[in-house]
Amino acid sequence: YTSSKLGYVTVKGVFNGSTLTVSEDAKYSVSVVDAPSSLGLSALTGHIVTVTGYYAGLAEPVQRIMATDVEDNGLNEIVYFLENFEWLEPWSVASGVGQTVETDNLDAKATALTSITVDGVTAFDAVEKLGYKFIYDKNDNKRIYLQQNYLKFGKTGNHAGIILPPIDGVPEAKDNVTLSFDWCGMRQGSGKIDPVNLIVIFENGSDKVQIDIPELGWEDGHKLEWVRAEVSLKGITVNKDTKITITQTQWEVGTANRWFRDNIKISEPIKL
C-alpha cells in the first residue's frame, strides 16, 4: 500500500466522496481519480468499498488510483435500530400529504394521524401497533401529523413527542454507539422559526438520563431543512426494557413549538 512501484492494485476502505480511508492507523489515504460515472461511486459515500485499478502515484499524504472496478460492501456501520417510516406510504398517498421541509412550503398539507385510515386502520394506530407510543398534552392526540412518510409534532398551543419501541441488542460499554435522527423546526408566516427545544430521555427503572438536543439557532426566514441530531450512548444502557422518549421541553404552553422528525437510527461505525 505504501509502495511507489505498484501497478494494478486493489484497495478496501471507507469512501467519503473522493478518497478511501483504509484504517485509522494508515499513513496514507487513497484518492480515486478519473473514475467513470458508470462505476456509481457518487452514491457510495459512507460505504465500505473495494476499488481495483491502476496506481497513479503519490501526492503526500494521498495515494492515487485510477479505478476500473468498484465493489460495494455496504454502509460503514452496524445498525441496531432503524426507522424511516417509509412504510407509511399507503397513508401518505391516501391523504395526499405534502413535504413541508423538502419544499420549504408552509402550506404543504399535513393531516392528523388519527384522521387517515387505510384498510380500517388509522395511521396513528398503525404506528403504535409497532410498539411506539405517542405522548401529547391536553389529552389531544390529534396534534401529531403525517407528512410524506415522516411525522410532524404539535400546533400552536399543543405539543407532542414519541416513545420508541423496545430495542434489544445494543452493546453496553461502547464509546461509539449513537442514537441519531433528522429533525426540523417549523417557520411561522412572519418568518420566525418556532423555538423548539428537543430532548431525548433514557429511562431504566428509576434511572433517568436526559440529553438536550442543540437548538437550531436559525435567523428569521431561514429555509426549512433537515438537521441531523446525534446522541452518544456512552454510559447509557439501552435494552428491551429501556424507555426512550424524543420530545420537547415546551409542554402545556400556548406558544407555537412545532417540529418534524424522520430517520431514527441507533448505530456504530465499523472499525477497519
Spans of features found by a protein language model:
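Extended, low-complexity, turn-rich repeat/linker tracts enriched in Gly/Pro/Ser/Thr and Asp/Glu
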Residues: 157, 171-173, 184-195, 252-254
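Extra-cytoplasmic beta-strand recognition segments
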Residues: 13-15, 85, 164-188
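Extracellular carbohydrate-recognition regions
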Residues: 74-126
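Short, surface-exposed beta-strand/strand-loop-strand elements in extracellular ectodomains
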Residues: 193-204
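Terminal, low-complexity interaction segments
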Residues: 202, 207-272
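Exposed beta-strand face motif in extracellular beta-rich ectodomains
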Residues: 47-49, 177, 240-244
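Short beta-strands within extracellular/lumenal beta-sheet-rich domains
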Residues: 149-178, 228-230, 261
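OB-fold and OB-like single-stranded nucleic-acid-recognition modules
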Residues: 1-76
